Amino acid sequence: MPRIALIHALAHSVEPINTALARDWPEATRMNLLDDSLSADLARSGHGLDAAMHERFQRLAQYALDSGANGILFTCSAFGPCIEAVARRHPSVPVLKPNEAMVAEASVGAGTLGLIATFEPTLRSMPAEFPAHVALDLALAAGALEALNEGDGARHDQLIAAQAARLRERGCTRIALAQFSMARARSACEAASGLPVLTSVDSAIRRLHARLS
């Protein structure tokens, strides 16, 4: 059975991916590594993804591999360059950014893609991951992550769904939820917008399963 290392920078990312893996790929063995200081340090340091942050990601990945991981899935979308560096160092192992599978799927559709995040650094880093031909309309669901941190999941989902509805009004043809922690809001976004909604959780599982099959 494949052993999948799930490396998290937000505690809220743990439940969505574990639930989805248990449902869609129960044969996989899961190991979870959480360092929630990564996101906090990125948000307050002002240094961006500097050498120290890159080194932290390399150490997390090496620990996962030393523990027998056959594949690594990072679940926080604000650290793309750090994850790419890990993948370059370990070319024989599937190392996935949280959004790369969703980006590939979303890039196939026509029209403008509405991209919603609840963590502002994600909206700064993620657009560069899309091919140049993909038209993006970005939206920050302000206050949603704070609501989730306070245990108000319904408010979190409502704020994200409100942005999905606004993106539909601005002409978007489909919606992508940028963070693993947002997967729970998929149904609310579909109901509010009437548009197809992609989540990084479901797309990542499909990609990782294909790589390790």
Task: Please report, for each region that a protein language model flagged, where it lies by residue.
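Non-catalytic structural scaffold of enzyme domains
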Residues: M1-S213
